[in-house]
From Swiss-Prot:
UniProt protein name: Ubiquitin carboxyl-terminal hydrolase 47
Gene: Usp47
Classification via Pfam families: UCH, USP47_C
Superkingdom assignment: Eukaryota
Lineage, broadest ranks: Eukaryota, Metazoa, Ecdysozoa, Arthropoda, Hexapoda
Main location: nucleus
Species, as recorded: Drosophila melanogaster (Fruit fly)
Ranges of Polar residues composition bias in the record: 208-219, 628-642, 661-673
Family: Belongs to the peptidase C19 family.
């Protein structure tokens, strides 16, 4: 870390929001932090989505609106003073009136300390104010407060409280109060003998107030203890200006006894903490040395005020705020500090739940033995006296390894089951194979969940004990399946232990499977056990669901009648008789698990589906009626079950597996609801009322309370699990969603019932988030337990607990602060990242090398060389790795001096988080040696005559100063392989030092000054991005409904460069091995030197005039991987520019890339020439330069249209790419104007797409460009929609064009319509549009045009001319319509009550399909008659069959048609099956049933089978690729995991600057 970056200060943020619970926080600000980063830091500590942030400077200066300066460095904001404590004001969004002269009254809190009393009324002399303190060079500065206190009476300390509290016993005289204000600390500077004190006026935050209040005591021994409380961020003391006035403070002396007592108390503080002592001349051994410098990742590692975010040094304790952690720290309300009675405010229930009421004070030392953990625990009464309202942060989440949400949900439910957790704690580990022992790893995980200071803990140790490798984390599984498999594994491991019957005692119930003869009433039973009860959501074959789990349970025990051909052979009657077959519950388990079977199979569509129907469940469930069966219970059950179909909730549809419910064939059930369903909204408000009657009627032990709801969100093909769980200690409900734990309400629980949202497609748009598994606990005062507290842990757990924490601390210290998720399959891996600059893509790529054996740098190089495809640039012999700090974009050193291939010392010095940079060299060059302690420079190459620029290139130099020097010049010349005397060099001061070089064979001071001026004004804030652009030819733009832009005449005589010139190199001149040819930048500088340089006075008024160090403002991000490497030339010299002769310059001049926007003679951007003056300040000059990239890197690009057809995806596929160098302070409006000129598409008709569908809105004309440096943007063509506009995909249907090779209807274009567009208007617009696209649509007219509404992949409705086009506002999927060109004699507008079908004739004699035809059936039409009219088949010889597949149903094999049993030949009308289950647009086959099928020989069958297979592959590879069913792996837990061989592998390379 450089000196510049190590500068930091503290700011206080005062929340002025009415009703705010957190009035003030403190934030650490580094010198390289942008305003936006500071706003983001503050936003993590408040629940507001948006807020106004103002800076209230000192000396009554005007307020500064920081929201308008987001890209500016915080240190450079006018009024921000790093030497002082700055104050930020947080206001609700839109509430500031813009009055900059207003001053906010800020509550400056001071620490209250009760006065230390002396006996005999004597006063000790105070030390002289301003006493000189000497500091030995090399020692750390010791922060020493200059405060003291005195009292007329003698001070004593209570020995009983000395280990638990830092207190000063005092006895004060009545009616006497004294206040003494002192400074909090003395700060001595290196090289100075005096450490001036800060006055309270200069640093009010550093003031300490010592109060003595009126108290009385019964005896000198029974004294009231006073708490010493300090401000939360004592570490963040601001340095004091030397010019600050020094005031003498009248401090009362502290007697020797008091100082000795204070010394004893302060020794209890943990090491590494900075403290403020009230003693002015306390001995030096009372003070702790300075904490280490803060890192950029510390906020994410523990700066939150949450109790789960403590570091390893604080066991169970809440932070006191003097932590050496960067970031935000909450400040306690003054009402909770230093109460008169010496007690603490009440502690919340959930915090007691986590820590069991056994808290250690925040300043108490961490215990290292099991006895210490228990003996140091306080009582429950003391715990309740702690600070309240810590919120659900007291619960710890579980890290999702990849797709292990199902595992996390079940583990949290088991952890929150007191009986299971306590029993697991009672189990004792008795062998040495820890890694493979499932109960032991589960026990450790539960201890972590109960005691860890983290926000979330890992599950990798547990999954390794399952025998899972890394691929298992990427498999989706069912939570109910996992529950059964895990319980089986635990039972196996618990054998021959005291917990052998744990699973059966808690979760096992019993039922009788019976058959009862209805003639002799003989009943045969077989007892079965169950761990969960699977409840169908719908009765078999029904489209209506059970309304509640009680109904489903009654249906579960409803007997089946065996009659007819299925009669029961009664042994007593000696004959077949009618019988009842069913289930009786014999006993229910203590923990009852109900599994709602929401996943089913639709035999019509032949797809898996998810049933999202509404099924209610109570919080109190009485099951005694299912055990206490009366004689007529069967009749009662029968009667109840008979009403299921009538009284259940309406069909809410099913979630199709294909494309998350949007792509399959959906059968819409009846939309009618039972009248009782009109009260669905009121259903379940009193969730216990549904069993209130049964609770009264059925008495017994089986009364249950709900405590866990496992929820699935998604479709049958995949989704996400999370859990709602109740804490039995406080009866509060929480949502456990992987790492996040939040409070929920009863409304959240009711929403988990499921049910429809009430849209046109009830089956396709039903809410897919609903309860999947429920857990109830039996209400039994004798058996119900509470979770074990720390003090109640068994002895072996008390021994394990400190070991667990020690392992965690060791892991943290070994891996350092940049901790990565451990790979499942490779437990002891070192996984370095290797970076490489790809010159073809002009961007940095990254791969991660997995080393499971002893580390060897040569193996890492070989693996990275292969994965990063470096072989196309240089052989392995000309490659090397250098040590690299990816978080800071800096080279650490080269490795020539390291003789150890394991790099043991270097890796240890970097906390084993060392990354590498892969470099290669030219054949005639040698690698440069990089000594340690150098500086990495960003070097840009610029041609001042054309303003062409490239870079940045990483150049490592031993030059420590951040100015141009001979050392830096030599490093640049060596690295870029150019003459040291033939280039100009200019530098700018920045967080990352930048240098700009320009070729000049005869450099002059004037030319150098010109370059330096340009660097200071135009170049200092340059960053870079990549832009992927699709095809923008006329045909493509017409299909997408996008117009073109007329070429703008060049202003100021600038050239307009056409698309061919955007490549930067003339055809045939491009060479990937010399992509950065220095000749491209050699220009005669005489002409630009004769032109006037930019006016610096004018520039000072531009947007970035107040920013002297803004070059990194755009790239700040909390994810360090995004900053790794920059877009830098990291290979050594292989593609470095070569020096060339002057004769080459003229030839290379034509290859020079010009910026597509226009530059005037001095190179500054003339914004007014192409940008609306309303969008930009008139004086704004921002740099913009684009150069075409040789290769298009489409990795990591996304689309906001998540459901694209193959044709559309091909249209939008990037065909060319550019590298953009842009000034960071450019407005989005100007940025898009440049892109508009670059791609010749109006700004209103394209979007800039980021990865993960994160669009940059077109409405950001007044916002700065906030992008991640080096990230790739993708141009997505399409009109920016107005509020009432919608985008639709248009497909074309002409029956004559469809054959067996047609897999689906082609998407011919996109079209924008509004909410008032009718089908008739749509016909006119679409016919005209299709005529413009292609001549093959010339026969289409408004008269023969029909518009279908497309649902999924089938046509579902014909729109009448006066009908408005439909759009579901809640769906992010674009609406789709089909334009059909109807054949002659076909009515484009059939009746509303008719049924239009597409039919094909099947010829069994030829084994061939006929052409597509269309028929329309009226209400009284008979399908055979209609088919006979379009064919020569008599009506009595016709057979027909419905095809259940996606339109046009060409994926059926000709060999299987004759074998189908679904042919019908009976008369059928619309009210009879199968037409009553048919929708408009379905496809039927028909045939002459009297024609026999052709008999094939073996050879003919073989040939036809091969031909059909090839055809289906051609059809299926297009139509089923996205919908191909994933091959599922069975969930297994291996009780004996095999060892895996060690090797070295590398991950696939990816873009460094993309959010992953």
């Amino acid at each position: 870390m450089t000196d510049k970056e190590s500068e930091q200060c503290t700011v206080s943020v005062f929340d002025q929001t009415p009703g705010s619970e957190q009035k003030k926080i403190n934030v650490v600000v580094r010198s390289h932090f942008t305003v936006k980063r500071v706003i983001d830091l503050i936003g993590t500590q408040f629940s507001y989505e948006k807020f106004e942030l103002l800076l209230q400077p000192h000396d009554n200066k005007d307020l500064v609106n920081l929201n308008a300066l987001e890209s500016q460095l915080m240190y450079e904001v006018a009024g921000f003073e790093p030497q002082l404590k700055n104050h930020l004001i947080l206001l609700p969004s839109g509430s500031w009136d813009g009055d900059v002269t207003k001053r906010f009254e800020l509550p400056i809190k001071r620490v209250v300390v009760k006065k230390v009393m002396k006996s005999d009324g004597e006063k000790a002399k105070s030390p002289a104010t301003g006493e000189k303190k000497k500091r030995v060079v090399g020692e750390k500065t010791k922060k020493k407060p200059a405060s003291g206190s005195s009292s007329p009476s003698k001070a004593k300390t209570t020995s009983e409280d000395s280990l638990a509290k830092t207190s000063i016993s005092s006895e004060s005289s009545p009616e006497k109060t004294s206040k003494i204000k002192t400074t909090a600390a003395k700060i001595s500077k290196p090289g100075s003998e005096k450490a001036p004190r800060a006055s309270p006026e200069e640093c009010p935050e550093l003031s300490t107030e010592i109060n003595s209040k009126n108290t009385s005591s019964e005896s000198p021994v029974a004294k009231k203890t006073a708490k010493v409380t300090s401000k939360p961020t004592l570490e963040l003391l601001s340095p004091i200006k030397p010019s600050s006035p020094i005031k003498e403070l009248d401090c009362e002396p502290v007697d020797t006894l008091s100082k000795q007592q204070l010394s004893e108390q302060l020794q209890l503080y943990p090491q590494g903490r900075n403290l403020i002592s009230p003693v002015d001349d306390a001995p030096s051994d009372l003070f702790i040395s300075d904490a280490e410098q803060l890192s950029d990742d510390d906020l994410a590692l523990g700066a939150s005020a949450s109790p789960t975010m403590l570091g390893p040094g604080y066991d169970y304790g809440a932070p006191t705020g003097d932590s050496d952690v960067e970031g935000v720290t909450g400040v306690t309300d003054p009402s909770t500090i230093g109460t008169d009675d010496g007690t603490y405010p009440a502690l919340s229930n959930f915090y007691r739940r986590k820590y069991g009421g056994d808290e250690l004070r925040a300043w108490q030392r961490v215990n290292t033995t099991g006895a210490d953990f228990v003996s140091s625990a306080t009582t429950e009464t003391e715990a309740e006296a702690r600070q309240a309202s810590l919120g659900p942060r007291g619960y710890v989440g579980l890290v999702n390894q990849a797709m292990t949400c199902y595992l996390n949900s079940l583990l949290q439910a088991l952890f929150m089951t007191p009986e299971f957790r306590n029993a697991l704690y009672r189990w004792e580990f008795d062998n040495d194979n820890e890694a493979k022992n499932i109960p032991y790893q589960l026990q450790k995980l539960f201890l972590n969940l109960q005691t860890s200071p983290k926000a979330a803990v890992e599950t990798t140790d547990l999954t390794r004990s399952f025998g899972w490798d890394s691929t298992e984390a990427w498999q989706q599984h069912d939570i109910q399946e996992l529950c059964r498999v895990m319980f089986d594994a635990l039972e196996h491991k618990f054998k021959n232990t005291k917990q052998a019957n744990l699973i059966s005692n808690l979760y096992e119930g019993k039922m009788n499977d019976y058959v009862k003869c209805l003639e002799c009433n003989t009943e045969k039973t077989r007892e079965d056990t169950f761990l969960d009860i699977p409840l169908p959501v719908r009765p078999f074959g029904s489209s209506s669901a059970y309304g509640s789990i009680e109904e489903a349970l009654r249906a579960f025990v409803q007997p089946e009648t065996l009659d007819g051909n299925n009669q029961y052979l009664c042994e007593k009657c000696k004959k077949k008789c009618d019988a009842h077959k069913g289930l009786h519950f014999k006993s229910f388990p203590y923990i009852l698990t109900l599994h709602l079977k929401r996943f089913d199979f639709d035999y019509q569509t032949m797809h898996r589906i998810k049933l999202n129907d509404r099924v209610t469940f109570p919080q109190t469930l009485n099951l005694n009626t299912f055990i206490n069966r009366s004689g007529n219970s069967g009749e009662q059950n029968s009667q109840l079950n008979g009403t299921v179909d009538d009284c259940s909730t309406a069909d809410s549809g099913s979630a199709m597996e294909d494309d998350n419910l949007s792509s399959g064939v959906v059968t819409t059930a009846s939309s009618s609801q039972h009248e009782n369903d009109l009260n669905d909204e009121d259903e379940g408000i009193d969730m216990s009322s549904s069993t209130s009657k049964s609770a009264k009627q059925g008495s017994g032990p089986y009364l249950y309370e709900l405590f866990a709801i496992m929820i699935h969100s998604g479709s049958a093909s995949g989704g996400h699990y999370y859990a709602y769980i109740k804490d039995f200690d406080n009866n509060e409900w929480f949502c456990f969603n992987d790492q996040n734990v939040t409070s929920i309400t009863q409304e959240d629980i009711q929403r988990s019932f499921g049910g429809p949202n009430g849209s046109y497609y009830s089956s396709a748009y039903t809410s897919s988030t609903n309860a999947y598994m429920l857990m109830y606990r039996q209400v039994d005062a004798k058996r119900n337990e509470l979770v074990a507290k720390v003090a109640d842990f068994p002895e072996h757990i008390k021994t394990l607990l400190p070991k667990l924490h020690s392992e965690e601390e060791t892991r943290v210290s070994r891996l350092g602060r940049h901790i990565t998720v451990t790979d499942l399959a490779l437990p002891d891996l070192y996984k370095p990242r290797v970076y490489f600059y790809n010159p073809s893509l002009k961007k940095m790529k990254i791969t991660r090398v997995y080393v499971s054996q002893s580390f060897n740098i040569n193996l890492v190089l070989m693996s990275a060389y292969e994965m990063l495809n470096v072989e196309q640039f240089a052989p392995l012999s000309r490659c090397r790795l250098v040590a690299y700090n990816s978080s800071m974009d800096t080279i650490i050193q080269s490795l020539e001096s390291c003789t150890d291939p394991a790099l043991t010392e270097l890796r240890a010095a970097q906390n084993y988080s060392l990354d590498f940079l892969l470099e290669y060299r030219a054949e005639d060059q040698e690698f440069e040696v990089y000594p340690p302690n150098g500086i990495t420079w960003y070097v840009f190459k610029v041609d001042l005559s054309t303003m062409a620029m490239d870079g940045p290139f990483l150049v490592y130099s031993a030059a420590r100063e951040r100015e141009a020097s001979d050392v830096l010049r030599r490093s640049i010349a060596l690295r870029l392989h150019i003459s040291e005397q033939q280039f100009l060099l200019a530098t700018v001061r920045a967080t990352v030092p930048k240098a700009f070089v320009s070729y000049d064979p005869h450099p002059t001071p004037e030319a150098l000054q010109h370059l330096q001026n340009m660097a200071n004004t135009q170049f200092k804030s340059i960053t870079y991005f990549y832009l992927n652009v699709p095809n923008t030819d006329a045909a493509t733009l017409e299909m997408l409904g996008v117009p073109t832009v007329e070429s703008v005449e060049c202003a100021s005589g600038g050239d307009v460069v056409d698309a061919a010139m955007m490549n930067g190199v003339a055809p045939g001149h491009m060479s990937s091995s010399n992509d950065y040819d220095w000749r491209r930048y050699k220009r005669d500088l005489v002409e630009p030197m004769s032109q006037p340089s930019p006016s610096h006075g004018h520039e000072s008024n531009s947007e970035d005039s107040s920013l002297s160090d803004g070059d990194r403002t755009l790239v700040e991000t909390d994810n360090m991987a995004h900053r790794g490497g920059g877009d830098s030339q990291v290979s050594s010299t292989s593609h470095s520019p070569q020096l060339s002769s002057p004769e080459d310059e003229a030839a290379s001049h034509d290859a020079m890339m010009r910026v597509h926007a226009y530059c005037n003679g001095n190179g500054s951007y003339a914004a007014a020439d192409v940008v609306d003056p309303l969008l930009l300040p008139t004086s704004t000059n921002h740099f913009f330069y684009a150069t075409k990239v040789e290769c298009v890197d489409v990795v990591g690009t996304g689309s906001s249209s998540g459901h694209q057809s193959d044709e559309e995806a091909q249209l939008r596929k990037p065909t060319r790419a550019y590298k953009l160098l842009v000034g960071t302070h450019m407005r989005m409006g100007a940025f898009k104007k440049h892109i508009e000129q670059l791609i010749q598409v109006p700004a209103a008709h394209f979007k800039l797409q980021r990865k993960h569908d994160n669009n940059l809105s077109n409405n950001q004309n007044n916002s700065l460009v906030h992008l991640i440096e080096g990230e790739t943007l993708t141009v997505e063509l399409g009109k920016t929609l107005e509020p009432d506009e919608f985008k639709a995909k248009i497909h074309f249907l002409r029956l004559a064009d469809i054959d067996n090779e047609t897999s689906k209807l082609p998407c011919v274009c996109e079209w924008v319509y509004n909410a008032n567009t009718t089908a008739e208007q749509a016909k006119k617009e679409l016919v005209a549009k299709l005529h413009r696209i292609d001549a093959k649509y010339a026969t289409l007219s408004v008269q023969n045009c029909r518009i279908w509404l497309k649902g999924g992949r089938i046509p579902i409705k014909i729109l009448s001319d006066d009908e408005t086009l439909y759009c579901d506002m809640r769906s992010s999927i674009a609406a789709e319509f089909i334009v059909q060109e109807c054949e002659e004699e076909v009515d484009p507008q059939p009746k509303d009550d008719s049924l239009t079908l597409f039919v094909r004739r099947w010829c069994p004699a030829k084994l061939e399909f006929g052409k597509f035809q269309e028929i329309t059936l009226d209400q009284d039409s008979e399908i055979r008659l209609s088919l006979s009219q379009i064919s020569d088949i008599p009506i009595d010889k016709l057979s027909y069959m419905k095809l259940n597949s996606n339109f046009p149903c060409t994926s059926i094999s000709a060999l299987s048609v004759n074998e189908s049993s679904s042919w019908y030949s009976v008369p059928t009308t619309l009210d009879k099956y199968p037409l009553n289950s048919t929708q408009t647009g379905n496809i039927y086959l028909y045939k002459d049933r009297t024609v026999p099928a052709r008999e094939l020989t073996l050879e003919e069958r073989r040939l036809m089978n091969a031909r059909e297979k090839a055809r289906l592959d051609r059809v299926g590879c297009v139509s089923t690729t996205r919908y191909a069913q994933r091959r599922e792996r069975a969930l297994k837990i291996y009780l004996d995991s095999p060892e895996k061989s060690s090797n070295v592998t590398a991950s696939a390379p990816m873009d460094v600057h993309v959010n992953n």
